[in-house]
């Protein structure tokens, strides 16, 4: 149905409530997300953009980083994943310490301030029978030679995997990795934090509560995390709002408890199905992300997460640089990283590419009439690449 004038008025009232930094209820968030009127969506877009401006200003940030997926050998079989391989299967790989070191060295030569380190769950990845020892060695391989780098690594799923392999608590794993030099965790493996969805797309992964528990423990132990949502597959609008609500509650709890760290950003990861396993690909019915849907979710995320998670980032790997740049008008304030390489999404059939230069990111930002700023992983500004162009 087409929303009536009264309902359009309600849309604006709710968006204005979010702009006033008053938290939306799940019911209110769902009402916004289910808007089916172009005029209503323009209101939501405008308010998302205004809230972005209020919380973080006009400057668009980016980070110079390198993504290292150290292995695609994985014991799990997620129904959306085209990256994983069994050991010995065609296309399987496992980087050596030397290869990881050389990739890091190359990244530093290109000005990287961050290495993002993630991989498949490989039961053979052990040193002297210990999974934790292997992961500690990964951290030390990088931080031992490049202590200035921020090491952003290991999702909650990887933390659970290490703990399960070695019979340790999550806290013990997190503390050992932090002591070795790990600086923060990516909030990947969240997918959708609703177990009905997880049973369909990733039945072997940790459940929603475990993901949230590990994120909270990371914060408690002083390790910042990001947060993500993979949308555009089998989830419902209600489940998108539930996911956002659980992220917001997790952040509120970490801040209320006075933990030394918290969630630094929210990233939408639209589903890419071109090379995904056939069952889910057929069920979803399209191979590439729906840009309009992604933009709408990003605007809703900005309004719903409000003052609690203020940095919002689109995925240029999934949406392409043009799509990601458009997201800067829908509540986003960051364009992410240069990456230098990326395998997980690319192997799923994404068309956005695997590497962008800082200049390409800067030019995309300039095209919006907003200034750019190079940042660190934790959103501290780096003065080397500050652009003070006039705003439109």
Swiss-Prot record:
UniProt superkingdom: Bacteria
Listed InterPro entries: Aldolase_TIM, CofH/MnqC-like_C, CofH_family, F420, FO_synthase_su2, rSAM
Pathway it works in: Cofactor biosynthesis; coenzyme F0 biosynthesis
GO MF terms, alphabetically ordered: 4 iron, 4 sulfur cluster binding; 5-amino-6-(D-ribitylamino)uracil--L-tyrosine 4-hydroxyphenyl transferase activity; 7,8-didemethyl-8-hydroxy-5-deazariboflavin synthase activity; iron ion binding
Reactions performed catalytically: 5-amino-6-(D-ribitylamino)uracil + L-tyrosine + S-adenosyl-L-methionine = 5-amino-5-(4-hydroxybenzyl)-6-(D-ribitylimino)-5,6-dihydrouracil + 2-iminoacetate + 5'-deoxyadenosine + L-methionine + H(+)
Cofactor(s) required for function per UniProt: [4Fe-4S] cluster
Residue span, Radical SAM core domain: 60-307
Cofactor binding note of this UniProt entry: Binds 1 [4Fe-4S] cluster. The cluster is coordinated with 3 cysteines and an exchangeable S-adenosyl-L-methionine.
Residues that hold [4Fe-4S] cluster according to the record: 74, 78, 81
EC number: 2.5.1.147
PANTHER family with a match to the protein in the record: FO SYNTHASE (COFH), LIPOYL SYNTHASE 2
HAMAP family: FO_synth_sub2
Functional summary from the UniProt entry: Catalyzes the radical-mediated synthesis of 5-amino-5-(4-hydroxybenzyl)-6-(D-ribitylimino)-5,6-dihydrouracil from 5-amino-6-(D-ribitylamino)uracil and L-tyrosine.
NCBIfam families named among the record's database cross-references: CofH family radical SAM protein (TIGR00423), F420_cofH (TIGR03551), PRK07360.1 (NF005609)
Family: Belongs to the radical SAM superfamily. CofH family.
Name used for this protein in its record: 5-amino-6-(D-ribitylamino)uracil--L-tyrosine 4-hydroxyphenyl transferase
């Amino acid at each position: 149905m087409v929303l009536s004038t009264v309902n359009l008025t309600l849309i604006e009232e709710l968006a204005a409530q979010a702009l006033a930094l008053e938290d939306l209820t799940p019911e209110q968030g769902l009402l916004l997300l289910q808007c089916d009127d172009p005029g209503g969506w323009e209101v939501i877009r405008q308010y998302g953009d205004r809230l972005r401006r209020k919380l973080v200003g006009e400057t668009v940030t980016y980070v110079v980083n390198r993504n290292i997926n150290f292995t695609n050998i994985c014991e799990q079989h997620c129904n959306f994943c085209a990256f994983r391989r069994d050991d010995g299967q065609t296309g399987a790989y496992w980087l050596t310490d030397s290869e990881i070191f050389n990739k890091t060295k190359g990244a530093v030569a290109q000005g990287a301030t961050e290495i993002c380190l993630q991989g498949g769950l490989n039961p053979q990845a052990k040193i002297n029978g210990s999974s934790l020892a292997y992961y500690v060695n990964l951290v030390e391989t990088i931080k031992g030679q490049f202590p200035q780098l921020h090491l952003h690594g290991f999702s909650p799923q990887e933390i659970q995997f290490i703990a399960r392999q070695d019979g340790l608590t999550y806290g013990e794993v997190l503390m050992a990795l932090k002591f070795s030099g790990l600086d923060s965790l990516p909030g990947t493996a969240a997918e959708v934090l609703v177990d009905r969805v997880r049973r369909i797309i990733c039945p072997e992964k940790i459940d929603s509560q475990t993901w949230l528990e590990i994120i909270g423990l990371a914060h408690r132990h002083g390790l910042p995390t990001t947060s993500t949502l993979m949308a555009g597959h089998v989830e419902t609008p209600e489940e998108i709002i539930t996911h956002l609500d659980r992220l917001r509650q997790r952040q509120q709890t970490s801040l209320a408890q006075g933990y030394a760290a918290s969630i630094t950003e929210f990233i939408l990861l639209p589903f890419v199905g071109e090379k995904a396993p056939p069952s889910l690909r057929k069920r979803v019915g399209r191979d590439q992300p729906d840009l309009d849907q992604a933009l709408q979710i990003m605007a809703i995320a900005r309004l719903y997460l409000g003052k609690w998670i203020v940095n919002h980032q689109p995925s240029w790997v999934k949406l392409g640089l043009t799509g990601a740049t458009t997201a800067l008008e829908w509540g986003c304030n960051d364009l992410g990283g240069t990456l230098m390489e990326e395998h997980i999404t690319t192997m799923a059939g994404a068309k956005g590419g695997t590497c962008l230069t800082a200049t390409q990111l800067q030019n995309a930002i300039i095209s919006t009439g907003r200034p750019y700023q190079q940042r660190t992983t934790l959103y501290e500004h780096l003065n080397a690449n500050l652009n003070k162009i006039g705003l439109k």
